[in-house]
C-alpha cells in the first residue's frame, strides 16, 4: 500500500528556486519535510498538496509550479517514512501528518477559509478526512484520482480473497465525503488501472453540493496533467474566487 522513496531533492534542483524547505511537527513528535512557497499576497489562498503512495517530494514539483505562478501559496508535504522522513506510514499517521500541515499554516496566520486541500491518489484519503471534520472548513478540496476506500481497492485487486477483514488502513472516504461543506472538485482518468474511474465517480456521487467533476477519456492514473487537467482545475479555482478568472 505504501511505497516510500528515500530520495530527498531540494526545491531549486526541481525548478523551484524560491521555494523553501520547512519542517512540520506532528502531534506524535515527528518532524517532516515540506516545501513552502508563501502566497504573493497576504490575502491569497494557500494550497496544501498531499501526494500519493509512491515516489518522493520532488516528483510533484512540476505539478505545483503553475499554482505558485498564479500567486497562490503552496505547501507541498511529504509523508512519514517518505523522502528520508522519520516514522512508518499508516492511516492514523498520515492523518497526523496532514493535521501538521494545516497547523503550520494556521500558525502563520493563514485562516482556514484561505486553505485549499489537494489530494493525489492516496492523499485524497487524507484530504477527505481533514475536510470532513466539523471544526475545519477549507476554501476548497481538490481530489485527483480518488477512491471510495482502501478496502474497496483491495477487494477489486484481489477479488478471490476475503481482504475486507485483512485491510487495517481503511481510508473510508465514502463514509466521510458527504460531511464536507466546502466546494469539492473530483477528476479522474478513464484509463486509470491503479484506481479505476468508477471509484472516483462513486465518490463524487456520494458528495454533496457544491461539487464539480471532470473525467478525462485518454488519461490514466499519473498523466492527468498531460491531458488538460490543469486548465479545468484553474477554472474551478477561478469560479470559487481563489484565483483570478484568468488564472493569473
Range-by-range predicted roles:
Residues 104-108, 113-158, 168:
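Primarily recognizes the serine-hydrolase "nucleophile elbow" in alpha/beta-hydrolase
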Residues 191-195, 221-223:
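Acidic catalytic loop of the alpha/beta-hydrolase fold
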Residues 224-239:
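Post-His helix in hydrolase/transferase enzymes
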Residues 1-25, 248:
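An N-terminal hydrophobic leader/cap segment in hydrolases
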Residues 201-222:
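Catalytic histidine neighborhood in serine/cysteine hydrolases
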Residues 63, 173, 182, 196-205, ...:
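Short alpha-helix in the alpha/beta-hydrolase fold that links the catalytic acid
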Amino acid at each position: 500500500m505504501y511505497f516510500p522513496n528515500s530520495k530527498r531533492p531540494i526545491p531549486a534542483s526541481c525548478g523551484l528556486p524560491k521555494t523553501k524547505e520547512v519542517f512540520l511537527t506532528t502531534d506524535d513528535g515527528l518532524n517532516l519535510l515540506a516545501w513552502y512557497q508563501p502566497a504573493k499576497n497576504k490575502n491569497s489562498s494557500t494550497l496544501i498538496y498531499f501526494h500519493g503512495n509512491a515516489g518522493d517530494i520532488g516528483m510533484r514539483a512540476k505539478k505545483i509550479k503553475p499554482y505558485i505562478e498564479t500567486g497562490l501559496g503552496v505547501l507541498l508535504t511529504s509523508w512519514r517514512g517518505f523522502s528520508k522522513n522519520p516514522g512508518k506510514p499508516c492511516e492514523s499517521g498520515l492523518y497526523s501528518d496532514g493535521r501538521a500541515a494545516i497547523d503550520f499554516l494556521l500558525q502563520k496566520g493563514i485562516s482556514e477559509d484561505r486553505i485549499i486541500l489537494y489530494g493525489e491518489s492516496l492523499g485524497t484519503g487524507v484530504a477527505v478526512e481533514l475536510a470532513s471534520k466539523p471544526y475545519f472548513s477549507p476554501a476548497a478540496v481538490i481530489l485527483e484520482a480518488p477512491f471510495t476506500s482502501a478496502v474497496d481497492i483491495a477487494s477489486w485487486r484481489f477479488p478471490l480473497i476475503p481482504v475486507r477483514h485483512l485491510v487495517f488502513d481503511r481510508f473510508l472516504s465514502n463514509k466521510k465525503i458527504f460531511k464536507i461543506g466546502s466546494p469539492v472538485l473530483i477528476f479522474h482518468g478513464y484509463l486509470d488501472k491503479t484506481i479505476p474511474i468508477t471509484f472516483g465517480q462513486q465518490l463524487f456521487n456520494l458528495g454533496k453540493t457544491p461539487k464539480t467533476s471532470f473525467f478525462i477519456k485518454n488519461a490514466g492514473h499519473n498523466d492527468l496533467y498531460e491531458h488538460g487537467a490543469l486548465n479545468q482545475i484553474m477554472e474551478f479555482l477561478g469560479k470559487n474566487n481563489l484565483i483570478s478568472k484568468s488564472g493569473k
